[in-house]
């Protein structure tokens, strides 16, 4: 299944409040498809009033500057939402930890019955389960949007003959929405609290958060999963995360051709083994310099192929 279909399927399954916060992948594809052949930026009205290029230089450069502005607006949207959610999770986790301490402090004598204490702890567990699921979903939000951005940049370069992919991808890798180390620490902190308070629940959640091992499940399997039986709200988060993981799994497939910007490179190590994490800034095996080196290698290979073809056309012997 193509990435666009997977991306659309994920949007249909994700939390309703999140749907308009994702990369406008479909709209950007249409925009690229309708780019004029002369290399000039389309009218401002055709791109939701995005400022056009200066238009006082090479048409390709002006078009590249204009499209970069379009993508800048998308990056701003992604960053704003990601930062907002991450800050909310920091606050929410602190509130839950304080709530746990209060429950512990009044355990001996403050509760009228054991059932009241159990109910309070179950409410805390539910809150942890939901926030854990949403943080995992935010990690996949980062991965899918970055993957979509890479796809869009490739389509733009192919359509226009531009060279926007490499510099813009490098820039995107340093944006807040792609810097997931703080979020990963929050996930681990949440799992540590769950393991301490609810060992069985923690095992279930840690298994679900392992993107390298998570596989799509059918309806029968999901109906028997412990995480799907907590309640409707928790199930919505769980289902949304599964949909995101399914889309990411399609990106893990190794490419048949070498490409420094191939999404499979962000999902596999140098030895070809799948990485355990999503496409995030934590996948630091591919630094800016390595991508540049890979680009140089590609140019050298292309140059050799051109020389070989020219020699063959001239009837000269082919260098081995």
UniProtKB/Swiss-Prot annotation:
One example of a Gene Ontology biological process annotation: cellular response to cold
UniProt feature, compositional bias: Polar residues: 278-289, 304-313
CDD domains, A to Z: SPX_AtSPX1_like
InterPro entries listed in its UniProt record: SPX_dom, SPX_prot
Keyword annotations: Cytoplasm, Membrane, Nucleus
Location in or out of the cell: Membrane; Nucleus; Cytoplasm
Keyword Calcium part of the UniProt annotation: no
GO CC annotations on file: cytoplasm; membrane; nucleus
Record annotation: effect of changing residue 29 to A: In PBC; loss of inositol polyphosphate binding
Domain named SPX: residues: 1-170
Gene deletion effect: Growth inhibition, Pi accumulation in shoots and up-regulation of phosphate starvation-induced (PSI) genes downstream of PHR2 under high phosphate conditions.
PTM characteristics: Degraded under Pi starvation conditions through the ubiquitin/26S proteasome pathway.
Tissue expression as described in the entry: Widely expressed. Detected in root cells, with the exception of epidermis, and in mesophyll and vascular bundles in leaves.
Disordered: annotated segments: 209-233, 275-320
Biased composition (Acidic residues): 290-299
Source taxon at top rank: Eukaryota
Gene induction: Up-regulated during cold stress. Not regulated by Pi-starvation.
Subunit description: Homodimer. Interacts (via N-terminus) with PHR2 (via C-terminus) in the presence of inositol polyphosphate. Interacts with BHLH6.
Biological role: Inositol polyphosphate sensor that associates with transcription factors to regulate Pi starvation responses. The SPX domain provides a basic binding surface for inositol polyphosphate signaling molecules. Interacts with PHR2 to inhibit its translocation to the nucleus and repress its DNA-binding activity, and then negatively regulate Pi signaling.
Name of the protein this chain belongs to: SPX domain-containing protein 4
Organism of origin: Oryza sativa subsp. japonica
Gene of this entry: SPX4
């Amino acid at each position: 299944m193509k990435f666009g279909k997977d991306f659309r399927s994920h949007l249909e399954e994700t939390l309703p409040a999140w749907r308009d916060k994702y990369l406008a992948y479909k709209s950007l594809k249409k925009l690229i498809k309708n780019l004029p052949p002369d290399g000039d930026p389309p009218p401002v009205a055709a791109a939701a009033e995005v400022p056009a290029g200066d238009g006082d230089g090479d048409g390709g450069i002006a078009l590249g500057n204009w499209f970069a502005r379009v993508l800048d607006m998308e990056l701003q949207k992604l960053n704003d939402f990601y930062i907002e959610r991450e800050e909310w999770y920091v606050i929410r986790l602190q509130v839950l930890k304080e709530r746990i301490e209060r429950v512990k402090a009044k355990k001996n004598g403050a509760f009228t019955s054991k059932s009241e204490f159990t109910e309070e702890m179950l409410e805390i567990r539910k809150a942890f389960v939901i926030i854990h699921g949403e943080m995992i979903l935010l990690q996949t939000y980062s991965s899918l949007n970055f993957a979509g951005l890479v796809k869009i940049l490739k389509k733009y370069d192919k359509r226009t003959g531009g060279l926007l992919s490499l510099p813009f991808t490098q820039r995107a890798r340093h944006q807040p929405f792609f810097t997931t180390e703080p979020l990963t620490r929050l996930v681990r902190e949440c799992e540590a609290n769950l393991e301490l308070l609810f060992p069985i629940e923690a095992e279930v959640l840690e298994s679900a958060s392992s993107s390298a091992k998570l596989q799509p499940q059918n309806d029968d399997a999901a109906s028997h999963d412990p995480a799907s039986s907590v309640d409707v709200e928790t199930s919505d988060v769980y289902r949304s995360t599964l949909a995101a993981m399914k889309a990411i799994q399609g990106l893990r497939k190794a490419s048949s051709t070498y490409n420094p910007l191939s999404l499979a490179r962000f999902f596999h190590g140098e030895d070809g083994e799948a990485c355990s994490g999503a496409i995030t800034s934590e996948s630091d095996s591919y630094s800016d310099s390595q991508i540049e080196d890979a680009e140089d290698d590609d140019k050298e290979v292309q140059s050799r192929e051109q020389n070989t073809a020219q020699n063959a056309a001239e009837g000269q012997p082919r260098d081995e």
